[in-house]
Structure formats: C-alpha cells, structure tokens
C-alpha cells in the first residue's frame, strides 16, 4: 500500500454520498451484494470512500475499521486491481492479498454472506490472472464453488454471488468440457444459465450482471449466442452507474463494443 494508486478517472459528485445520503441510497448501492448498513461509523465511512472511487483510502479505512470493514477493503482492492492496476504482477498480488483478508473475515464471521462471496471474487480474479487451468490445478475451483454456494445459502438474493456462480461454471465448462466439469467441479450449463437469470432478475440495473452473463454465453455457446451477448453488452454500456465501481463496469462494456 506504500505506492500511490492510480486515481479513479471518472470523478463524479453524484458518487459522493455525504452524510445521510449514504444510508438513503444504501439499498440501491448494495442491491448486488446484500451488505447490511454498517453499525460502525468507521465502516460506513470506508464504504463512502469506495462508492466515490477513492479505492486506496477505502482499503485503508476498511482495514482500520476491522470486522465488517474488511469487506470494504477486499472489494475496493479487487475493483481497483481489476480495472485500474496496469502492472500484471501487482494485480495478482493485490487479488491474492485481498483473498487472504476475505478468508480471515469469513473464518471470524461465518454468517457473513458477503465475506464468502468476496473470498470467491478475489480468488476467482486471481485464478483468471494465472489462467483458469492453473487455478483448477491448484484446487481453486472447489474453494470458489463452495464459497459462492455458502454466500447464496446465507443470502439467496445476493445477485453478485449468483452471477459469479454462473461465470465460474461457464469458465470451468469452457476449460475442461461439460462432462469433466460436471463430475469433478459440479459445473453444469443449465445451472450456469439459471444463476445468470437469477442475477438478472435480482439486479437488472447492474452493468456487471449483464457483462458476466454475456461472457458466459460466449463461453458456453460460442458464436451461436454472439448476438445475445452483444445485446447484453449494449445494455450494460447504457446503464446509469450509481457509484464508481458501476462506472468502471459501464466503461468496460463500452470499450468492448468499440
């Protein structure tokens, strides 16, 4: 954390949820991850920084707040690494560190659905960075699957966990084939599609839900579903972002369409 991170390039005053605005907007901001409004002011402040795009400060604030604040730190570090970190080695290190924080949090608070999801999110992004094949060989597949299943058991309306479960299954099927994916990793095409549709139903405003669904369709069906995937990307690109993370998702969708 010594190195100053790249600043969020799309600063927007509407993402600054000062004072009571944060609680008022909380349901919309956290429709995707079902994070409850923080009991501790320090954790609320960390989330305020996250939504504004002050990711490095959000990590520091979340780590200092401890307990539920760890979830902010993990999510902020992963969003930053995914979209704004330009060095591949640093990106992997950030994901790996965040996965460790999330693993500690879920061990300390096993009923925290978001901690399980964020562990899977960080580990999944790390796995994508080293290659899906290497991640599966190192046993990440089962860990990601189990963490997402636990998150959805604890919070059935967790849209981000639902779409991540669809994405996980799609990537495994694409890498090892349907039969091995089903027998070894419990990944099935029908289940992937079901979880994508669930996420769309739970959080239709989310750009990342549309993006991951589109990616999943390409992995599962290839060119046969390219038109559907393109339409989902177009819908993602047209969404009105509620915070910095969603703005980065929207910009990603737009760049993929260019």
Each language-model region and where it sits:
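C-terminal interaction module
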Residues: 210-216, 220, 234
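Conserved alpha-helical positions within TPR/SEL1-like repeat arrays
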Residues: 117-118, 163-164, 211-212
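Alpha-helical adaptor scaffolds
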Residues: 157-204
């Amino acid at each position: 954390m010594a190195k100053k991170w790249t600043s969020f390039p799309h600063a927007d005053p509407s993402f600054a949820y000062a004072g009571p605005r944060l609680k008022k907007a909380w349901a919309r901001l956290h429709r995707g991850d079902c994070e409850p409004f923080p009991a501790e002011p320090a954790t609320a402040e960390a989330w305020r920084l996250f939504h504004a795009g002050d990711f490095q400060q959000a990590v520091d604030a979340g780590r200092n707040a401890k307990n539920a604040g760890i979830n902010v730190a993990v999510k902020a570090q992963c969003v930053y690494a995914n979209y704004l970190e330009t060095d591949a080695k640093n990106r992997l290190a950030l994901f790996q560190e965040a996965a460790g924080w999330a693993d500690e949090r879920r061990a300390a608070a096993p009923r925290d659905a978001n901690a399980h999801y964020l562990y899977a999110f960080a580990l999944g992004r790390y796995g994508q960075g080293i290659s899906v094949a290497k991640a599966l060989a190192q046993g990440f597949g089962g860990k990601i699957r189990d963490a997402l299943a636990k998150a959805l058991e604890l919070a059935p309306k967790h849209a981000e966990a639902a779409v991540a479960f669809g994405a996980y299954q799609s990537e495994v099927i694409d890498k090892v084939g349907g039969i091995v994916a089903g027998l070894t990793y419990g990944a099935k095409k029908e289940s992937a599609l079901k979880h994508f549709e669930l996420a769309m139903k739970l959080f239709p405003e989310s750009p990342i839900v549309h993006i991951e669904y589109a990616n999943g369709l390409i992995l599962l069906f290839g060119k046969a579903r390219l038109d559907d995937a393109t339409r989902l990307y177009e819908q993602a690109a047209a969404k009105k972002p509620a915070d910095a993370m969603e703005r980065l998702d929207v910009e990603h969708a737009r760049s993929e369409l260019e």
